[in-house]
Amino acid sequence: MPKSDIHPTWFENTKVLCDGKPLCLIGSTKSELQIDMWLANHPFYTNSQVLIDSEGRVEKFMKKYRLDITEQ
């Protein structure tokens, strides 16, 4: 017999948003997903040589854990 209450809540109609605009509905464990990029605005698919200006991994980590980069 399977264990009860060990699985996350499943949302059948999860909204996928890009820049605040709804893109589609999917199934997920989150009620809403915010994405930065998708095929309609990705430089590879739009044939543009635009530099993607997004936070680097280190900066994102430091911001997430509220750390100061100048700390030694």
UniProtKB/Swiss-Prot annotation:
The keyword Thylakoid does not apply. Its main location: plastid. InterPro entries: Ribosomal_bL28/bL31-like_sf, Ribosomal_bL31, Ribosomal_bL31_sf. Keywords: Chloroplast, Plastid, Ribonucleoprotein, Ribosomal protein, RNA-binding, rRNA-binding. Coiled coil: none annotated. The keyword Ribosomal protein applies. It is found in: Plastid, Chloroplast. One of its GO terms (molecular function) is rRNA binding. GO terms for biological process: translation. It comes from the Eukaryota. One of its GO terms (cellular component) is ribonucleoprotein complex. Binds the 23S rRNA. Part of the 50S ribosomal subunit. Belongs to the bacterial ribosomal protein bL31 family. Type A subfamily. This is Large ribosomal subunit protein bL31c.
